Design a protein with these regions (language model features):
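Residues within membrane-spanning alpha-helices of integral membrane proteins
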Residues: 5, 49, 103-106, 110, ...
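Hydrophobic alpha-helical transmembrane segments in multi-pass integral membrane proteins
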Residues: 44, 85, 89-90, 139-145, ...
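Residues that define the loop-to-transmembrane-helix transition and helix capping
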Residues: 42, 70, 96-99, 127, ...
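Membrane-interface helix caps of multi-pass small-molecule transporters
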Residues: 17, 21, 33, 84, ...
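Interfacial loop-to-transmembrane junctions
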Residues: 164, 209-230
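Small-residue-rich hydrophobic segments that form or flank transmembrane alpha-helices
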Residues: 4-73, 133, 137, 145-203
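Transmembrane helix exit motif
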Residues: 56-64, 92, 99-126, 212-213, ...
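Membrane-interface helix termini and inter-helical loops of multi-pass transporters
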Residues: 87-97, 120-122, 183-195, 239-242
Length: 242
């Protein structure tokens, strides 16, 4: 087994474990290393999306009864439109200043929500949903990291961790399927991506099973703080890999 194959396998375990435990973070975790293992950045984001699709599909099937489509469509459709535009505009990512701003913003926002989450309740209005979908679309299209804006919306608007997980994963599943189609149209779905997906598939299965066990034992009252903490960690990861 080559070092690249082993790296993709191990990264897939870690990314799917995080996704299954916190509801997001697959792309943020795996994209810290995947661009260095793939021929191009576009192929790296495509592989990340394919593996994330597999993780989300397994979660959605298990929690499908918790999905409320009426609250999902506005943010999802906005995300699809914005991320499609962003992917078509993507040639290469060189804007280090934007990534620094993104990292700092995630850290500050997560700390704010940790401190004041009991006093904050995001309304499920169209304006809030469109705003979250727009930010998520920009981050997903350019960086393959569409999670944080949508997660902040769902964790504040859904009544239980099961509802949150079901809504977030349905959102990510449909969004990633769409983005993968657009990336394939732009030539990023190559034979290298296909083979590397098979290498990472076993890791996804292992990570998802481990994450499901941990998720089951996390009390509702502290779950959102775990999510906020990982958003903060995500900000530091983005800053360190800038």
């Amino acid at each position: 087994m080559s070092s690249i194959v082993l790296s993709i396998f191990l990264l897939s375990i870690g990314a799917s474990f995080i996704q299954r435990t916190t509801g997001f973070g697959f792309g943020i975790f795996i994209m810290t290393m995947l661009p260095f293992l793939m021929p191009t950045y576009g192929e790296a984001t495509t592989l990340s999306g394919l593996l994330a699709i597999t993780t989300s599909a397994a979660i959605v099937w298990r929690l499908r009864n918790y999905v409320t489509w009426q609250r999902l469509w506005p943010i999802l459709l906005t995300f699809i439109i914005v991320s499609t535009i962003a992917i078509f505009a993507l040639t290469r990512i060189e804007d280090h200043i934007l990534r620094r701003i993104l990292g700092v913003a995630l850290i500050l926002i997560s700390i704010y929500f940790m401190l004041f989450s009991q006093k904050i309740k995001l309304p499920t209005t169209k304006r809030v949903q469109v705003g979250a979908g727009t930010l998520s679309g920009l981050m997903g299209g350019f960086f393959g990291m569409q999670g944080p804006p949508a997660v902040l919306y769902f964790i504040q608007s859904e009544p239980t961790k099961e509802h949150y997980m079901a809504m977030a994963q349905t959102y990510f599943l449909i969004g990633n399927v769409m983005m993968t189609g657009v990336r394939a149209y732009n030539g990023f779905f190559t034979t290298t991506v296909a083979f590397d997906y098979l290498y990472g598939l076993g890791g996804v299965i292992i990570g998802t099973m481990l994450g499901a066990y941990v998720f089951k034992h996390i009390p509702n009252r502290i779950f959102r703080y775990i999510v906020y903490a990982y958003i903060c960690i995500s900000g530091f990861i983005i800053l360190m890999t800038n």
